[in-house]
Amino acid sequence: MTQFLISIMDITPLSDSLSGDKALYDKAFKLVPGYRQQKICNLKNDAAKCRCLAAGLLLNYTTRTFISGSVSGFITGSLADNTPTVKNIPFPVTVSAAVCTYAQEYDYETACIANGKPYFKEHENLHFNLSHSGNFAVCIVAGMPCGIDIEGNRPFKPSVAKRFFSKTEYHWIYDTENVSVQAERFFRLWTLKEAYAKATGNGIAAEIHAASYVPDTDSDGLCFADSEIGKHFQIKEAEHNGLRIAAVLSDSAF
C-alpha cells in the first residue's frame, strides 16, 4: 500500500448538471451516504451543494484507489521521499469516472474531533482530508495524519500578511516588487498554514503562528523554519490551473 494519495476533481460537470437536466447530479447524489445527502440538502447555495457532493465522490474514489494501490506515477509515496514539490500531482479524477466506479463499500463511517477535523471511525490507520476552491475539490488519503488545502491567488492586504505571518515570511513575500509573485507567495504560505492546522487537527486559529516556512535551499519548494517540526512533518506542494495546493503529512498521531 502506498502511504498517501492526493487527487483533484473539477466539479463543473456537477454544476452544469444541477442547473440543467440534473441527470448526472441526481445519479451522483443517490450514490453518496445518507449523512452526506442530508448535509447537501441542508445547504442553500447550489455551488455549496456541488462542492459537498464532489467531496463525497472524490473521497470514495481516492480511498478505494489508495487502498488498492492502483495508481502510480502521481502523488503517491512515503515520508522517505523528501521532495517538497512534485510536478505531476495531483491525480486528476473526473466526475464521470468517480460516478461510474463508485464503490459503496469504501464509504467508511466518519466522525469529527472537537475542532472539526474528520476521520474514519473504524479505520484508525487510515486518514483523509478534503478542501475546495472555486470549481475544484482536492482530497488526500494517507497512512498517517494529514491535512490539505487549495487556494486561488487573489488580492490580499499587507496588513493580513503582517498579522499572521512571521517576519521571515513577510519579508520573503515582499522581497520582490512583482505583485503577482507577492500574491503567489502569500497563498503558498497560507495553504501551508491551513494544511498544517488541518494535519494537527487544532484549527487555523491555534496553529497560524505555530509553524513558519522558508525557501528550501535544495529545491524550489518551502520547508519548515523550525527543523524540529520538520523532523515529524513533510510538505507537498503543487499548482493546478492557477490554484495553489499544499499538503502536510505527519509521522505522529495526535
Where are the regions that the model predicts?
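Core catalytic alpha/beta fold that binds nucleotide/phospho-ligands
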Residues: 1-254
